[in-house]
Amino acid sequence: MTVAATFEIEYLQFLGPDGKLVGTLPPAVADAKALLPLFKQMLFVRTFDTKSIALQRTGKLGTYAACLGHEATHVGIGASMKPEDVFAPSYREYGAQFMRGVKPREVLMYWGGDERGNDFEGPKNDYPWCVPIATQCLMAAGAALAFKLRKEDRIAVSCCGDGGSSKTDFYAALNSAGAYTLPLVLCVINNGWAISVPRSAQTGAKTLAQKGIAGGLHCLQVDGNDIIAVLEGMRRATERARNGEGGSVIEFMTYRLHDHTTADDARRYRDEQEVKDAWLRDPMTRLRTYLTAQ
């Protein structure tokens, strides 16, 4: 038998759920003090998220998509970009956007029904929140193509959920990135659920990262609750993009600890024990435990 091709998907993890090291730290975070500003930012994101949910519950905010449990992934992605890069988020990546200069009041304006919240004071080159699923991925691919044609030292980063990786725009984006060797990083935030559809019902692929193989992209799976792994995965992908080596697909393994939005009741389709188990992998507790031990 002749084998036409084989592939492997590397999994990155440095901090286990108990906050203990399971691998050699990357040089950039060998000193635990380097993680303190990121922990503070994660704490801010969680506080903002909790307050926003409370505002919605008391009728002071419209439907809101919480990011509870995504703090390490979002902050790590935002910390890995340069100001001149372009970020194309979905509707949940507040942690990354805060790192990019988006104001908390702009988030509240948007979810309060005021589209002026999408006119960011800070990152003028970033795309606004995108509610249609995965269309932002193709927008980012277009930006990446422009950077290449202009020979600019810039990259494009886009986020979508596990459900978004089943959409045609996601596939079109990764195919374009591979065909034209674009400086694009596609971040698939796998939180286990596409609203009420579990990961197991979305695709037959063993990993979501491997979907990039078909487009000729570099693929990686990362523990999205371990901010050190997030930073290292993004470092590899952004360096490849800046060096002209093409795009990447990174699957960040995390969990949606809240409902899909405040208009959803996840208790109707999600097992209570599953959520309890997910809290044991909480990114905030994990990083706090590690930092306290240093």
What is the role of each PLM region?
Residues 128, 132-294:
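Glycine-rich ThDP/TPP pyrophosphate-binding loop and its adjacent helix/strand module
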Residues 16, 89, 221-223:
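Structural signal for conserved beta-strand scaffold positions within catalytic alpha/beta enzyme cores
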Residues 12-19, 40-53:
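N-terminal glycine-rich anion-binding loops that anchor highly charged ligand groups
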Residues 47-50, 54-180, 198-204, 209-216:
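Cofactor-binding active-site loop characterized by glycine-rich and histidine/acidic residues
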Residues 1-27:
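Charged, compositionally biased N-terminal leader segments and the immediate start
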Residues 34-38:
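Short, contiguous, helix-prone interaction/anchoring segments in small proteins
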